[in-house]
Amino acid sequence: MNEIDKTIIEELASRVEELGGRAYMVGGAVRDEIMKRPIKDVDIEVHGISGAVLEAVLKKLGKPLRFGSAFGVYSLAGHQIDIALPRSERKAGNGHRDFEIEIDPFIGIKEAARRRDFTMNALLKDILSGEIADPYGGTEDIENRIIRHIDDKKFGEDPLRALRAAQFRSRFGFQVAPSTISICSALDLRNLSAERVEMEMKKALLESHRPSEFFECLREMGQLGYWFKELEQLIGLEQNPEFHPEGDVWTHTMMVLDRAAQFRPSASDPYAFMLLALTHDFGKITTTEFVNGAIHAYGHEIQGAEIAERFLDRVCHGSDIKKYISNMIPNHMRPNKIAEARSSVKKTNRMFDDAIAPNDLIYFAICDKPKLPHLDVRNLSQAPNEPHELLDDTSRESELYTADEKLREQERIKFLFDRLDLYRDMMARPYVTGKDLIDRGIMSGDDFGTILEYAHKLRLAGVSKEDALKQTLSYARKLRKNIK
């Protein structure tokens, strides 16, 4: 909250008090202040004066905008503040907007707060006195790190609250009260809009240190099945313990998801990167089998892209994200295999060229390693200069690594970043263009793309522009001669 908004809020509260009312900061802003978290959105609730009187007050402070007439909600032009009158709500249909609203400035603090979801969000702070009104024990629940619903009936009127409970658990590291888990388990999430589901999932993926807790919480509630059925299918799906000592595909996915959160700030698209971590092994649902007494999932990286696309069609509405996922899942196994084999520059160039986000591909490969130590990612935007930049030996997971294994892992990571530098250097050099070919008599045609692709392969192989042009011209003439 900036100083200008703070001044406006205090002026509003003073004018309301002069008229016999009281203005409170409510909801998440009060919770975040108590938790010493940054306050993003400020909501004000004005008690004890009518809507007409409130509008008159707001007109003296600026230009009031009534954007929620049915809810008695206002804002002031140029300010990030929502101002509302107290209200009660009653479910009147299956849609998330199907509520009967009754605005009542004199309803009282406790009844006004009853419509809120959790005790920690039912706090009010008197703007002038600083006094906290806590009708449902929210401050104690914050101290005890508990997410607890307020009213059984009203809580169950909005099924989205099951997802909100999971989202708060992942972001705050709180536990959801058993009674709240129980009531969430009985909610029907099928009529929720995909946009609302994605909104809660996105908060968990982008704002949590442990985004896995969002999905673990939904699992405890028994609420994965409709919106996240692919994730539910990972539970109990066995993996080869030689390569995945951590357990089933669900456990592996949750571990990768939490590791990916460390790389989130450096990823080219943080949200897409986190969705990659979430969906990367969906292909194991259809490919896992026993072969000669061992568990394998051959080709899961290929089939996984299609399954992930169906998942994204259900819960995600970004074409760029779908493009990212459909490219990265088929490629996600390549870095670790290539690093293990110390493959040629030509091969690493092809890998990075195929990837929509080469840096992210390396970050993800690090996350996807079983038995991986905790990572210090502060310096991962460049090839590391020192091994300790990538491994934190104080991590409990790092105890699973021997000294030799740690060294090999450091070397593999450095190998990939070194090769990425080589690839970028190669891509910065002069190369054969379509204009170069046209200038030398190779006119555009149906096969022009094939000819340019040949030139690009030479570029990836490190062939100089001069030599690549000669070879491409020769290839083009032979190709067209054969076609004729």
Q: What are the residue ranges of the model-derived segments?
A:
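Catalytic cores of the polymerase beta-like nucleotidyltransferase superfamily
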Residues: 1-484
